[in-house]
């Protein structure tokens, strides 16, 4: 039963990661109001972060309980751990910086403010981390057993 639950959790986490990335693209491509698109995408990514936190903790604990210290020799374990670190860095590190830059720019749009360059830099870092997390998610799918 725990094995099947871990497969369901992997499916939920990986699906949410990939779907949020696709949804963010569609939001920015479709909506003329880029601030609204950013707000909606941010909410999606926040939800996915919490899914990731819960999923990672379950998968890591399950792996250690199932394999003991041998779990530390598995690519699956390390992929989940790195994904967890990326979620933590993104949600509790990078996102607050982006939010701070947006609020400092008010009432102007951050992209039309003196904070635009810093925002673009941090947003780029967040994008690279997210893509890396999505690639590691592929490792989870391939290594799940």
Task: Give the label of every model feature segment.
Residues 13-14, 78-93:
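Hydrophobic alpha-helical membrane-insertion segments
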Residues 59-67, 130-145:
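Transmembrane alpha-helical segments in integral membrane proteins
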Residues 1-72, 100, 106-116, 120:
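Interfacial loop at the N-terminal end of multi-pass membrane proteins
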Residues 22-23, 89, 93-96, 139:
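Transmembrane alpha-helix boundary/anchor motif
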Residues 47-49, 124-131:
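Membrane-interface loop-to-helix entry segments
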Residues 32, 66, 94-95, 144:
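Short helix-capping/hinge motifs at transmembrane helix termini and TM-loop junctions
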Residues 67-81, 145:
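Cytoplasmic juxtamembrane regions at transmembrane-helix boundaries
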């Amino acid at each position: 039963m725990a094995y099947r639950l871990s497969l369901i959790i992997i499916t939920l986490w990986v699906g949410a990661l990939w779907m949020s990335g696709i949804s963010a693209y569609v939001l920015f491509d479709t909506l003329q109001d880029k601030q609204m698109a950013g707000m909606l995408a941010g909410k999606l990514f926040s939800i996915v972060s919490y899914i990731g936190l819960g999923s990672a903790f379950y998968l890591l604990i399950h792996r250690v309980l199932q394999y003991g210290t041998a779990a530390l020799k598995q690519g699956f374990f390390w992929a989940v751990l790195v994904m967890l670190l990326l979620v933590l860095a993104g949600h509790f590190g990078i996102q607050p910086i982006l939010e701070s830059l947006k609020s400092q720019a008010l009432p102007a749009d951050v992209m039309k403010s003196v904070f635009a360059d810093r925002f673009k830099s941090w947003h780029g870092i967040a994008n690279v981390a997210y893509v890396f997390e999505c690639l590691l998610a592929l490792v989870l799918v391939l290594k799940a057993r």
